């Protein structure tokens, strides 16, 4: 069973995402921020990471940069609802840093599941 790490500071969103992903046969780990997510990944790597981009502390952009530097083959889906610049600017930057897929919040479940399946093939 593939393992997925969700990094997002929004507890409700993380819980909802976890339930949806688990219902589709995946094992899920959670972290409330980039710093915690990186620590968790270093201790027990997962097959895929789904990370929000706009978070307090170590944001998703910094998280992707650090993980890709140390683990170049890591598979990452970046998600964003926007912020001051708008979601497309953050998602474009995440893609440039190595995120294989980018999705805009609110997440469309079929689109997310398709991205997960493609990356875990």
Name the predicted role of every residue range.
Residues 79-81:
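Hydrophobic/aromatic residues positioned on beta-strands within the core alpha/beta folds
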Residues 44-50:
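Active-site beta3 strand of CheY-like receiver
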Residues 39, 61-73:
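Short amphipathic alpha-helix used as the core "switch/output" element in two-component signaling
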Residues 11-29, 97:
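Two-component/phosphorelay signaling modules centered on CheY-like receiver
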Residues 30-39, 60:
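Helix N-cap/capping motif at the beta->alpha junctions
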Residues 62, 83-103, 110, 114:
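Alpha4 helix (beta4-alpha4-beta5 surface) of REC/receiver domains from two-component response regulators
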Residues 55:
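Receiver (REC) domain active-site loop signature in two-component systems and cognate sites
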Residues 8, 52:
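Active-site residues of response regulator receiver
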């Amino acid at each position: 069973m593939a393992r997925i790490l969700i990094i997002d500071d929004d507890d409700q969103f993380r819980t909802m995402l976890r339930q949806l992903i688990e219902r589709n046969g995946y094992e899920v780990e959670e972290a409330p921020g980039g710093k915690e997510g990186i620590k968790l990944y270093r201790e027990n790597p997962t097959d895929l990471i789904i990370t929000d981009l706009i978070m307090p502390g170590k944001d998703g952009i910094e998280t992707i940069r650090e993980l890709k530097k140390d683990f170049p083959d890591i598979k990452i889906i970046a998600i964003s609802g926007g912020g001051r610049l708008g979601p497309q600017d953050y998602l474009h930057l995440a893609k440039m840093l190595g995120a294989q897929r980018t999705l805009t919040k609110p997440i469309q479940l079929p689109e997310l599941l398709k991205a997960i399946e493609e990356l875990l093939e």
